[in-house]
């Protein structure tokens, strides 16, 4: 992401720079649109569909679910994350490329500092000054989440100038929730990830009893928080697990 810094003084040369971050004519300048995929990258889409052995239309929908959904102003076309999209085309498969590029240690520290729960990341409303703002003196985590790509604009009430912000796509949601596992569930991420996979398998074959049994067994291994926040802690554990399941 690109972090916004405040102009240092009224005489700063930075004042000569025009900020086009939320200007509609530049809405698609930092990413790739669906139209560009269907035209300029059509051969890449066909090749990916062939390698995944899926219809082209289905592959496009999967790409949208995983890497699409960014908006830097409103109205705006849906913007794909170019880093993840190009890696998917190059590898012939869909993976978690963005989170593979680095661990969001600073973000996790800030989530803890501002007391932001996993279930409260995204799904919020804000005016532009609350998120398109310098981060060096931020009093909340929204500017950092927005400018680093963890949340994006999803809607806008233009009459009142208030924006709806949310997590852009499945790649970001699942990657973010995986990074929260050590803080909220257990440092043994292997157990959590395999449990989630086995839960998905059970749900896919409509084995609700098996899914509940897996969930109960897993929760019995989560350290109990002997304080007034214990119930809320387990609520966040459930939220992370079901987010990892794509729900």
Where are the model-predicted features located?
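Amphipathic alpha-helical segments of the small helical/lid subdomains adjacent to P-loop NTPase cores
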Residues: 4-15, 20-88
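Extended alpha-helical interface modules used as scaffolds for assembling large macromolecular complexes
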Residues: 78-247
């Amino acid at each position: 992401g690109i972090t916004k810094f405040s102009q240092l003084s009224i005489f700063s040369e930075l004042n000569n720079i025009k900020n086009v971050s939320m200007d509609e004519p530049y809405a698609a300048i930092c990413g790739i649109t669906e139209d560009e995929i269907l035209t300029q990258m059509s051969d890449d889409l066909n090749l990916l569909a062939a390698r995944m052995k899926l219809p082209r239309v289905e592959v496009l929908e999967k790409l949208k679910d995983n890497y699409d959904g960014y908006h830097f102003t409103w109205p705006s076309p849906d913007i794909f994350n170019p880093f993840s999209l190009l890696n998917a085309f190059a590898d012939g498969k869909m993976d978690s490329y963005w989170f593979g590029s680095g661990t969001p240690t600073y973000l996790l520290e800030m989530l803890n500092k501002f007391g932001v729960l996993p279930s409260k990341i995204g799904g919020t409303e804000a005016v532009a000054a609350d998120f398109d703002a310098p981060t060096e003196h931020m009093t909340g985590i929204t500017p950092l989440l927005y400018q680093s790509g963890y949340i994006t604009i999803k809607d806008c009430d233009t009459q009142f100038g208030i924006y709806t912000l949310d997590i852009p796509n499945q790649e970001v949601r699942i990657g973010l929730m995986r990074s929260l596992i050590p803080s909220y569930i257990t440092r043994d991420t292997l157990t959590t990830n395999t449990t989630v996979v086995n839960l998905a398998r059970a749900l896919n074959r409509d084995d609700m009893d098996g899914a509940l049994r897996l969930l109960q067994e897993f929760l019995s291994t989560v350290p109990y928080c002997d304080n007034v926040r214990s119930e809320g802690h387990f609520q966040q554990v459930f939220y992370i697990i079901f987010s990892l399941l794509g729900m």
